[in-house]
């Protein structure tokens, strides 16, 4: 299984804040396992920390603003996108003001610094949320929508549509996060000339200029109005009849605006709190719908906190019944594992098919057959035993004996025709032949029982 990652070392970036115009420095630091993303305002008394999760987003007008107990940090999305796309799970971010510096309006400097300091693998397993069915969020008032579909990896398709002759419908896609650096990171934020005066009047974009945003002039205005706006922006006067991009830097890609919207989607969905395996299809996305979708995903995750393993009956098993018989001393009717379909250093997934011919159904119960709970635990324990035996050389010469079982819960009946899917994982490294494990049994997507085990590996006499 993939492990969590953090930075090998800290790095800092400095620049103007897009909306405040303040000189700001943000520092990204390594963080321990299961820390997640946290942002610390080191300029305030007590240096308060905000969890970087969608539930703490309070404003989305022209960027993503996180708030907690009156403490705010804005314009976080580009830094968050870089962390998420490069697979960083745990990071403490310190900033000396109310927003991240805008830099050049893209995520490329974050990516460069992450690559410079490097990343390191941690002990904890990366906790993916696997999309198993379509999830959709629509905003009928704007025509925006975000859909996520099952997929083996995280990928995105983004469509933007504006009432503009300069930016027609644009499409951007990212099939693999490994391509984020080359295909997305350098895409810059953008603004329409018609939006600049209202934004300035609202006290925003005080640090905006042609070096940190693409500025698009697509609706003709009078030369006088255009000259006044140029004076406010601090740029030379230009011909009001000449529509188009007014930046002195050329576009990185013809569809740079769509690519930047894709970057923003990644940054906002990083606030879900877990990496996703699924394909995102976003139509006319923006920070508002991105955040609403991220909140919906957090609710989905809470509802399905324990996910059943994926079972593909066409894949070759890791262990078939014959190999299991070589490792476990159990025999009919007490060999209760049919096959192992997945196994890593710290986890295992096994299967027991429940048929009407099971001998225990003769007495439990003849008129309403139900698999005894103690046998469900026995089957789970056998799967865990296979995991533990996998940690030693010549496993055929060892047996596993269980010393303690705790936290047993039965949630649903198991009946003939069910397929029991077991997932057992180590809670700590095996020490001196002693292991502690947590196991879940599923029928379909539902947890039917769970338990914790302590076991000892003993060499056979």
Curated annotation (Swiss-Prot):
One of its GO terms (molecular function) is UDP-3-O-acyl-N-acetylglucosamine deacetylase activity. Signal peptide: none annotated. InterPro entries: FabA_FabZ (IPR013114), FabZ (IPR010084), HotDog_dom_sf (IPR029069), Ribosomal_Su5_D2-typ_SF (IPR020568), UDP-acyl_GlcNac_deAcase (IPR004463), UDP-acyl_GlcNac_deAcase_C (IPR011334), UDP-acyl_N-AcGlcN_deAcase_N (IPR015870). GO terms for biological process: fatty acid biosynthetic process; lipid A biosynthetic process. Keywords: Cytoplasm, Hydrolase, Lipid A biosynthesis, Lipid biosynthesis, Lipid metabolism, Lyase, Metal-binding, Multifunctional enzyme, Zinc. Its EC number is 3.5.1.108, 4.2.1.59. The active site is at residues 287, 364. Its cofactor is Zn(2+). The keyword Transmembrane helix does not apply. It is found in: Cytoplasm. GO terms for cellular component: cytoplasm; membrane. It catalyses: a UDP-3-O-[(3R)-3-hydroxyacyl]-N-acetyl-alpha-D-glucosamine + H2O = a UDP-3-O-[(3R)-3-hydroxyacyl]-alpha-D-glucosamine + acetate; a (3R)-hydroxyacyl-[ACP] = a (2E)-enoyl-[ACP] + H2O. Residues 1-302 are annotated as: UDP-3-O-acyl-N-acetylglucosamine deacetylase. Zn(2+) binds at residues 78, 260, 264. The keyword Hydrolase applies. It holds the Pfam family FabA. Residues 303-461 are annotated as: 3-hydroxyacyl-[acyl-carrier-protein] dehydratase. Pathway: Glycolipid biosynthesis; lipid IV(A) biosynthesis; lipid IV(A) from (3R)-3-hydroxytetradecanoyl-[acyl-carrier-protein] and UDP-N-acetyl-alpha-D-glucosamine: step 2/6. It comes from the Bacteria. In the N-terminal section; belongs to the LpxC family. In the C-terminal section; belongs to the thioester dehydratase family. PANTHER family: 3-HYDROXYACYL-[ACYL-CARRIER-PROTEIN] DEHYDRATASE. Catalyzes the hydrolysis of UDP-3-O-myristoyl-N-acetylglucosamine to form UDP-3-O-myristoylglucosamine and acetate, the committed step in lipid A biosynthesis. Involved in unsaturated fatty acids biosynthesis. Catalyzes the dehydration of short chain beta-hydroxyacyl-ACPs and long chain saturated and unsaturated beta-hydroxyacyl-ACPs. This is Bifunctional enzyme LpxC/FabZ. It comes from Bacteroides thetaiotaomicron (strain ATCC 29148 / DSM 2079 / JCM 5827 / CCUG 10774 / NCTC 10582 / VPI-5482 / E50).
């Amino acid at each position: 299984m993939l492990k969590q990652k953090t930075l090998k070392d800290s790095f800092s970036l400095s620049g103007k804040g897009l909306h405040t115009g303040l000189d700001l420095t943000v520092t990204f630091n390594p963080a321990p396992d299961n820390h997640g993303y946290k942002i610390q305002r080191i300029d305030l008394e007590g240096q308060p920390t905000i969890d970087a999760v969608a539930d703490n987003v309070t404003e989305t007008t022209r960027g993503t603003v996180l708030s907690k107990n009156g403490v705010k940090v804005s314009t976080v999305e580009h830094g968050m996108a870089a962390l998420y796309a490069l697979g960083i799970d745990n990071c403490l971010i310190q900033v000396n003001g109310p927003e991240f510096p805008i830099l050049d309006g893209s995520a490329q400097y974050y990516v460069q610094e992450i690559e410079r300091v490097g990343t390191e693998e941690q002990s904890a397993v990366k906790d993916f949320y696997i999309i198993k069915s379509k999830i959709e969020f629509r905003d009928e008032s704007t025509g925006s929508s975000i859909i996520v579909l099952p997929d083996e990896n995280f990928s995105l398709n983004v469509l933007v549509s504006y009432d503009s002759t300069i930016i027609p419908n644009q499409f951007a896609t990212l099939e693999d996060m490994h391509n984020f650096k080359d295909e997305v990171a350098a895409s810059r934020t953008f603004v329409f000339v018609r939006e600049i005066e209202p934004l300035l009047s609202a006290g925003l974009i005080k640090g905006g200029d042609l070096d940190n945003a693409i500025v698009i002039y697509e609706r003709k205005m009078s030369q006088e109005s255009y000259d006044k706006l140029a004076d406010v922006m601090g740029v030379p006067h230009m011909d009001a009849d000449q529509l188009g991009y007014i930046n002195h830097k050329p576009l990185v890609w013809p569809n740079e605006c769509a690519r930047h919207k894709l970057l923003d989607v990644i940054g906002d969905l990083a606030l879900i709190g877990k990496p996703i395996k699924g394909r995102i299809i976003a139509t006319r996305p923006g920070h508002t719908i991105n955040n609403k979708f991220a909140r919906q995903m957090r609710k989905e995750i809470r509802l399905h906190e324990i996910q059943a393993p994926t079972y593909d009956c066409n894949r070759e098993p890791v262990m078939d019944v014959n190999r299991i018989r070589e490792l476990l001393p159990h025999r009919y009717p007490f060999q209760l594992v049919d096959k192992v379909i997945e196994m890593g250093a710290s986890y295992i997934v096994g299967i027991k098919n429940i048929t009407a011919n099971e001998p225990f159904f003769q007495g439990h119960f003849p008129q309403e057959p139900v698999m005894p709970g103690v046998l469900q635990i026995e089957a789970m324990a056998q799967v865990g035993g296979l995991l533990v035996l996998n940690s030693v050389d010549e496993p055929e010469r060892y047996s596993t004996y269980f010393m303690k079982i705790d936290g047993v819960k039965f949630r649903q009946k198991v009946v003939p025709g069910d397929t029991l899917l077991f997932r057992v994982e180590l809670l700590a490294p095996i020490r001196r032949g002693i292991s502690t494990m947590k196991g879940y049994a599923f029928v379909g997507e539902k947890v039917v029982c769970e338990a914790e085990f302590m076991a000892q590996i003993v060499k056979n006499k």
